[in-house]
Amino acid sequence: MDAQFSLDTKIKVGIIGFGRMGRFYWEAMRKSGRWEIAYICDTDPTTRELAKKISPESLVVENDQKIFEDESVQVVGLFTLADSRLEQIEKAIRYGKHIIAEKPVADTMEKEWKVVDMIENSNVLSTVNLYLRNSWYHNLMKEYIQKGEIGELAIIRICHMTPGLAPGEGHEYEGPAFHDCGMHYVDIVRWYAESEYRTWNAQGVNMWNYKDPWWVQCHGTFQNGVVFDITQGFVYGQLSKDQTHNSYVDIIGTEGIVRMTHDFKTAVV
């Protein structure tokens, strides 16, 4: 398949899954002016009615097969729950559609590796929602590192704790917190280090006696000697009257530090 897109031509896309994340993508695509949102698919009737109301130019469907069979559709956005992602990615490859996928790319590690193998052996372009690499604050911090302002990079510490979804609140197919949200930080730490992971140790807490850990702390090293420390969980005071967050990045070098705090409204470097 020809993967070249003209800047003057809108990219024709079908959105599959129009829940919270699907609507975020729809909004971003509308704002960019680069996309023709030809289809919106969702199995929920109420959600389909909402799609018809706010995106009247799109054909709203219940079954995604029509999107895959439309040869004019170049890209599919896969924003349903993780248990359906493998099947949809298989169909996208079979029908020659480029892929924008929400994370995680499947609901188990075995299926995720199957997705990786399929994509690597296909001729479609694919991307996963690991957006932190595009954020202004991470790019600014990396610029400080590249300019040598903190000396040689030595230690990367990331903490992200929120009163997010507790077990049973709609997060089951995405897996425990570290398997879903935590992958942002696994990815961004590697991006900073510019190296592959060498060693790691982790511990988790099965909050509320749930079967999976909802809080994980992982630390280790990269092949180039940089040390990392990631703390992530959805356990930060769900029942509090006034909810808060604890989100920060500390990057420590031989001659200085650069750090960022984020309260989900404002990031400060």
Q: Regions from the language model: what does each represent?
A:
Residues 1, 186-266:
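Contiguous beta-strand/loop segments that form the cofactor/metal-binding neighborhood of enzyme cores
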Residues 1-55:
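N-terminal Rossmann-like dinucleotide-binding module
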Residues 25, 55-118:
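Beta-loop-alpha module in the N-terminal Rossmann-like domain of NAD(P)-dependent dehydrogenases
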Residues 39, 75, 155:
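Short, Asp-centered acidic motifs that coordinate Mg2+ and/or phosphate
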Residues 62, 101, 128, 201-204, ...:
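Short loop/edge segments at beta-strand edges and connector loops
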Residues 83, 106-167:
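A contiguous active-site-proximal alpha/beta segment in oxidoreductase catalytic domains
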Residues 101, 126-128, 157, 230, ...:
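Hydrophobic residues in well-ordered beta-strands that form the structural core
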Residues 129-137, 160, 164-201, 209-215, ...:
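Mid-domain beta-loop-alpha active-site segment that forms a flexible
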